[in-house]
């Protein structure tokens, strides 16, 4: 894959129902440690130590979810930056260890502030390397790869309803009405151990990466997401349109969307 420049954009919105935004996201150059500002559009070469695209969707009363998401995101970013080039040599192991460290960081926050007991967060961390993409996932935030006009899920929801759908007990169209639709099988910070699911794929010129909270995929269909990514070549505009789709669907939850376009050859057409 060429390395002419990576175009990345992130945006987060409280939605139309919730009072607080308990989502947190990070887009960070793991070589310099620099983080993009909210709603930023960043054109950069893929850093030699990788680029981190991270979404955490916190849960817990009295704004504790916001704290859990922030603590986890900062812990993961800091650990990966501190590891430096070791991340590129062992990306899966580095991501897994970073998520485990975030789990301990959130639990330490609860020890220091017992009133926050029960808080936790989802975590979907995508590590973009010059030739590959490595994703670690806990909970029901998601990562997708858009390639050749196809939206490919890179994560599986770690939730009760997802498990019921996979086992054939629940129809996909009935998920949104199920009383356990928000119950996760695991989250960062809620138990002594966490086991992130790790996925690694080779990247190609022109690939588009999407990382999002369930505030997007919970109310916007995969077909609508794919159509938006197909019809909107500009990364910043695609990011805004995906957030707008969630708001037009009622904005029932906080929504966070990160989109990155991999470098493509001058002669390559966008999928």
What do these predicted regions represent?
Residues 1-271:
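PP2C/PPM-type serine/threonine phosphatase catalytic domain
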